[in-house]
Amino acid sequence: MSSSQSVPAMSSRERVLSALARKPVDRTPVCNPTSVATVELMDLVDAPFPEANRNPELMARLAATSYTELGFDSIMPVFSIIQESSALGCSIQWEQKDNWPTVRMGDPIWEDADDIKIPPDYLTHPDTKCVLGAISRLKKEYGDEVAIIGKTMGPWSLGYHCFGVEPFLLLSLDDPEKTKLALDRMKEATVQFGLAQIEAGADALTLPDHATGDLVSGEYYKRFLRDLHIELAERIPIPLILHICGRTVDRMDYIAQTGFAAFHFDS
């Protein structure tokens, strides 16, 4: 990506997508691929948590403040990381206005790779359907002006949510092959939700997969996730922004091999 005075003026959408494609831009885009939700913005547009996580109109209204109030070049309506897990059957702690919802990982739904099943109503569950509805609304209202970024959770994150963090990490130590099988099955939830968001109007997707430095090593990333992430980049045909929290220096070389458009290293 480079900025040049010779590049004609771009819309916010053109600017973000050109940057993700490593093409010249008229100026450096300002893009938040995770969430801009704050209590102040909720109050400003009357779209508070937890309702803004479950109502597509409120979700879209709050997300739009990224563009209308903050002047960013992107809108990202998925404020949490629970939608897929909720649709898969996990219990959710919805919290109040000043906190985001979380998965109750102490109450896992799966113990073995053979337990993994994607429900037939996965994409029509209220929490996944809400995201699709919000993206569709945003695309209709802002789609020509600003980049609409969705979010689909990676299989390692889904493993934490659906197996529990400690059981999933222990499984990776005790039975790496069964862990790979579990990841292979869970990735279908990632792909299905990602493709549905593209159909709804998403221009790019954030893909959080929390193989964080405090829990797994760079070699773990290479062993379990690099090739799987390469596959996701091939199967989901819009720019993907990988997110991993925390210190990730030891896996950057592997992440660079995936074909993802960008890497979001903390939030």
Which ranges hold each PLM region?
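Active-site loop segments of alpha/beta catalytic cores
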Residues: S2-S35, E40, F49, D73, ...
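Active-site-flanking structural segment that lines cofactor/substrate pockets
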Residues: A37-T38, M42-L70
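Pocket-flanking alpha-helical
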Residues: M42, S85-G89, L138
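Aromatic- and acidic-residue-enriched segments that line the glycan-binding/catalytic groove
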Residues: A52, A87-T102, S157-L171
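Short C-terminal domain-edge/linker segments immediately following a structured domain
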Residues: M59-S66, M105-E111, K178-A182, I236-P239
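Glycine-rich, N-terminal phosphate-binding loop and its surrounding beta-alpha-beta segment
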Residues: L62-I92
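A contiguous, low-structure linker/loop signature
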Residues: S80-D121, E145
